[in-house]
């Protein structure tokens, strides 16, 4: 396993002329679900086809959570379970918070995993984008935040309006691997809302109340955003 290498080779067609298939399992919070939606949009753009079962997939991707001990254990259990369920020759890829926070440990202790993809790795790209947030808390060069998403299959949808956090709470490690606050522009968010075609929008972020501060929008800048979104949905 090479945690910092790009995943382009993993995503090469295994059989020429046949569409490649993937299975994506998402763990953790609604923000992780948004990340998975954006990964699926990227997969679709690259010609990958989703399947309903890991034993039908050429690639099995686990979007992990590492917020608390129980979440980390669930991530490990899921990785092991999907590793057992995948068909012979299928690749097992681990991404998400656990891949970023504990990538080296996963690589060392879980031989079932073929690739660890921390934040900043373009999963479908051919070039690695190495990321090490650590004490410098650098933002990923490749960011899921503004990737397009497919239309929502449900009447409601989560929309992530910012990534990262500027607070330094002693009980929370999220800023060390999600990076500093990065707010999206109102135009970017409204475009995503329109494309989702959902009747109800739930806004999510690591720190919703801080939306816009890093962009110089001032305090309570989330209020005009909410009003504009409300004008667009039923």
Q: Where are the language model's segments positioned?
A:
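Alpha-helix-loop-beta-strand connector modules within alpha/beta enzyme cores
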Residues: 218-234
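Proteins enriched for Cys/Gly/acidic motifs involved in redox and nucleic-acid/cofactor modification
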Residues: 12-212
């Amino acid at each position: 396993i090479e945690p910092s290498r790009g995943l382009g080779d993993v995503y090469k067609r295994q059989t020429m002329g046949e569409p490649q298939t993937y299975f994506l399992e998402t763990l953790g919070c609604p923000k992780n679900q948004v990340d998975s939606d954006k990964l699926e949009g990227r997969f679709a753009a690259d010609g990958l086809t989703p399947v309903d079962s890991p034993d039908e997939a050429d690639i099995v991707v686990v979007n992990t959570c590492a917020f608390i001990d129980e979440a980390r254990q669930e991530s490990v259990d899921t990785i092991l379970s999907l590793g057992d369920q995948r068909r012979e020759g299928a690749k097992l890829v681990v991404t998400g918070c656990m891949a970023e926070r504990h990538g080296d440990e996963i690589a060392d202790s879980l031989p079932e995993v073929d690739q660890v993809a921390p934040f900043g790795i373009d999963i479908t790209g051919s070039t690695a984008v190495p990321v090490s947030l650590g004490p410098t808390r650098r933002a990923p060069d490749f960011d899921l935040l503004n990737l397009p998403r497919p239309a929502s299959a449900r009447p409601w949808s989560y929309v992530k309006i910012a990534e990262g956090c500027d607070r330094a709470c002693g009980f929370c490690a999220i800023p060390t691997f999600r990076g500093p606050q990065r707010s999206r522009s109102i135009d970017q968010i409204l475009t995503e809302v329109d494309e989702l075609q959902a009747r109800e929008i739930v806004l999510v972020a690591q720190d919703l109340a801080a939306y816009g501060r890093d962009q110089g929008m001032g305090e309570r800048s989330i209020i005009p955003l909410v009003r504009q979104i409300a004008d667009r949905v039923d």
